[in-house]
């Protein structure tokens, strides 16, 4: 995998965002890679790679109506 961590972001059609931090191993197991995108009936899914958890938290601080799910 290209990055150490990945951020799974579900942009719900109601206007909220649910985000989950994944290790590279977990992202790979889910079939994700950097810039992965998919549309479903309930949300748009985006996956972006990051080198650190701190970088993910910095990115998340700019998102509106975002909930970090563990």
Tell what function each PLM region has:
Residues 47-70:
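Low-complexity intrinsically disordered segments
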Residues 2-44:
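Short aromatic-glycine-(Arg/Gly/Cys) micro-motifs in beta-strand/loop hairpins
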